[in-house]
Amino acid sequence: RQSNLCLEIALPTKPLSNVEDDEGEIALCTLSAFNLGAINELDDLAELSELVVRALDALLDYQDYPLPAARKSTMNRRTLGVGVINYAYYLAKNGVKYSDGSANGLTHRTFEAIQYHLLKASVDLAKEQGRCPSFHETNYAKGLLPIDTYKKDIDLVCEAVSYTHLTLPTT
């Protein structure tokens, strides 16, 4: 079973038999965001990623956990969530629009840079402190990155959104 309170991503969970059950898992994700409006160069993301990964990781060790299952899941998985704010301003400041497709290239480059720098910061931290205990359960342990799990069918949906109806292939 998988869930996340904000429902933006799916995180592993295991059922609890009671609130003190330490065999269950409650998914928690410690969050932060890059203020894209303050980013001038994509290279700025390298240092910022290092800082945010280390800060959030340190927070995992000293925050309070109301239930053993929440602590267990967090300590074993060390899940971090890093998003963005000020996206619309970032696009405007760079002279592109979301509505006409001119932002597609910048958006792709920006989020590719964010993903790269966050992964690099996480790898650097793992080299220093070791992998999280549940690393072997992840796609990363299999050598898969998020881009490797991309479903091409989504392209059909994105290309067809201007139609009044849509039928996806059944094969």
Enumerate the predicted regions with their spans.
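Short secondary-structure junctions and interdomain/linker hinges
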Residues: 38, 55-67, 113-125, 129-133, ...
